[in-house]
Amino acid sequence: MGDRGGAGGSRRRRTGSRPSIQGGSGPAAAEEEVRDVGAGGDAPVRDTDKDGDVDVGSGHWDLRCHRLQDSLFSSDSGFSNYRGILNWCVVMLILSNARLFLENLIKYGILVDPIQVVSLFLKDPYSWPALCLVIVANIFAVAAFQVEKRLAVGALTEQAGLLLHGVNLATILCFPAAVAFLLESITPVGSVLALMVYTILFLKLFSYRDVNLWCRERRAGAKAKAALAGKKANGGAAQRTVSYPDNLTYRDLYYFLFAPTLCYELNFPRSPRIRKRFLLRRLLEMLFLTQLQVGLIQQWMVPAIQNSMKPFKDMDYSRIVERLLKLAVPNHLIWLIFFYWLFHSCLNAVAELMQFGDREFYRDWWNSESITYFWQNWNIPVHKWCIRHFYKPMLRRGSSKWAARTAVFLASAFFHEYLVSIPLRMFRLWAFTGMMAQIPLAWIVGRFFRGNYGNAAVWLSLIIGQPVAVLMYVHDYYVLNREAPAAGT
């Protein structure tokens, strides 16, 4: 056979045909391949065509088709392209939620009623207490401005200014809380919105006071470099720089109050123009997502919450867990939509209108592998304020990092409870407890979970933790406002 192969090879050479080894056919080629395998240990890699199929060529002598390799799902394989599995997960998620949606429609019918939403804001169409509260907030902004004007010219001492600012800031928190708690005509939703406005005003005026104080301290240290001090105080980025005390104008104050940030600067980064198409997209997103959230709450969450009251009353723990898991899906979906609506659509729309240049309102919190990373990246405006006006000042005063972090969580827990308990007119401290529980949870996740496991733990805390707080408050509110009056009659 070897001689015949050799003769065949020489005959092809004489007739001008291609060599047998190029086509991979013939016993000689096969024998050569066997020798190569014996020397190298692996089968030669076959040529492939443009579709990825092996180029068969003119022969049929495939003596070896196996090689040393791992399965794709093995960690040693190095394979990482699971795009098809991700698409499968998305398809399964859509199908499972479509089934839940159809089940909900069959069981309850269409519950979406946009007109009913108006009643959440107004009890009396001729009485708008929440809007009146928001308008009154201007008084506190003007008061802070007047204090700063007098401090700038030396008409007030720093101690007197600190006292006046403290009284003003304390009143900002106490005044709307008293009105919301005592005024019967204000609705819980209207109360929440008014208290959110006052909370934002509190944080902004706190920052306004701090930055102007830093400017005065630098001016006192080097009066000859007042303009440079004002530039350094805000980070040194501006097309048209303003120095202290030239920043103390109503125009500057109200630009800051409406800007999508909580941290004051003398010179904010500004975008060159308003992009009309970008702004229109954000406005359409705001409109669509608002309607979507209202529809999901009315159609999906409200029935789930109502059906959860009986298991809580009977203390049927298995049914409570089942209702909790049933509520977790719509609650988490609405929370994700709310995040996009607020931090991307709304804040970008406001920033575009005001040509506010810093658009970092969130970072990649969805990749969080620890609870700490999540809280540092999901709400950048609040995070920047906490670092600049709370965390770093505590460190400069000698506090430890652990004490400063605990104080930040404590302040956050207070404001969460402030925005929930006062509108509902009941104090159960569920929101406060939930926020303070983040401290040991952050330690546990950081200590025992890494990588994808840490990310899964963060997602699990978001998906399960929020519905627990929602059910606690709804149950207590239901008992307080439904069963108590019925028992009294």
Swiss-Prot record:
Region spans: Involved in homomerization: 1-88
Marked site positions, Important for catalytic activity = 417
Cite the annotated pathway: Lipid metabolism; glycerolipid metabolism
Q: Which parts of the sequence lie on the Lumenal side of the lipid bilayer?
A: 116-127, 182-188, 310-316, 422-429, 483-489
The GO cellular component terms are: endoplasmic reticulum membrane; membrane
* Major localization class: endoplasmic reticulum
- Sites binding an acyl-CoA sit at 375-383, 391, 405, 478
The way this protein sits in the membrane is described as: Multi-pass membrane protein
Q: Catalytic activity annotated for this protein?
A: an acyl-CoA + a 1,2-diacyl-sn-glycerol = a triacyl-sn-glycerol + CoA; all-trans-retinol + an acyl-CoA = an all-trans-retinyl ester + CoA; 2-(9Z-octadecenoyl)-glycerol + (9Z)-octadecenoyl-CoA = 1,2-di-(9Z-octadecenoyl)-sn-glycerol + CoA; 1,2-di-(9Z-octadecenoyl)-sn-glycerol + (9Z)-octadecenoyl-CoA = 1,2,3-tri-(9Z-octadecenoyl)-glycerol + CoA
Transmembrane stretches, by residue range? 81-115, 128-153, 159-181, 189-220, 275-309, 317-354, 401-421, 430-448, 451-482
Residues in a coiled coil are: none
Entry protein name: Diacylglycerol O-acyltransferase 1
